[in-house]
Amino acid sequence: MYVGYVLDKDSPVYPGPARPASLGLGPQAYGPPAPPPAPPQYPDFSSYSHVEPAPAPPTAWGAPFPAPKDDWAAAYGPGPAAPAASPASLAFGPPPDFSPVPAPPGPGPGLLAQPLGGPGTPSSPGAQRPTPYEWMRRSVAAGGGGGSGKTRTKDKYRVVYTDHQRLELEKEFHYSRYITIRRKSELAANLGLTERQVKIWFQNRRAKERKVNKKKQQQQQPPQPPMAHDITATPAGPSLGGLCPSNTSLLATSSPMPVKEEFLP
């Protein structure tokens, strides 16, 4: 065959006429010998194995915190474990070790019940005199005035003011006879009245004051005696005597009238 011819022929690839022992296996098992190993491309590469790698470029962030040393754990020991939260501990309330701060001692009931200007408090010389506004210091007893209501009259309802409402309205009337709109709204809100009720109260209070002042003026004026006329009594005699001569003179001077006599047959 052709394979045997090539092997028998002297060639520079297979020198020598000797046939290899593998020729008896047939043409399928025979193949060309493996080429010799090629020399390394960089024979001196091993000489650079001792070169250290280049350092990595620095990053923008620094290194993290170092791990805790072993001697720290040995010196301080592990920290106490946090207790697990129970549903009862989540409820609102003071902590177990909470102790309220004691309140400062206040004045006893005896001090509160002591009135102003009593024997325990020093009184000034001016406190002995009663002030002209003593009525302003009166306090209405609880439940004494009753609630604000209305009473029925013949034609309309009349508002019944409580003692507290009248006291506050009197205070305002003492300082100003004519209430302003702003003050009227404030008083109505504080006393539980309407602005119309406050306005009507001030109108009635001014009318009452005018009536009282007029009555005082009449009482202060002294009573005047009635006007006496000068009447002089004259005796009747002289006056008649004075009038009679004049009348007689008039009669004497007058001519006598003729009297006509008529006779009946």
From Swiss-Prot:
Residues 196-207 are annotated as: Interaction with 5-mCpG DNA. CDD domains: homeodomain. Pfam families: Caudal_act, Homeodomain. Intestinal epithelium. It comes from the Eukaryota. Residues 154-213 bind DNA. Disulfide bonds: none annotated. GO terms for cellular component: chromatin; nucleus. Residues 30-42, 93-108 have a biased composition (Pro residues). It is found in: Nucleus. InterPro entries: Caudal_activation_dom (IPR006820), Caudal_homeobox (IPR047152), HD (IPR001356), HD_metazoa (IPR020479), Homeobox_CS (IPR017970), Homeodomain-like_sf (IPR009057), HTH_motif (IPR000047). Keywords: Activator, Developmental protein, DNA-binding, Homeobox, Nucleus, Transcription, Transcription regulation. Residues 207-217 have a biased composition (Basic residues). Residues 73-92, 110-126 have a biased composition (Low complexity). This is Homeobox protein CDX-1. It comes from Homo sapiens (Human).
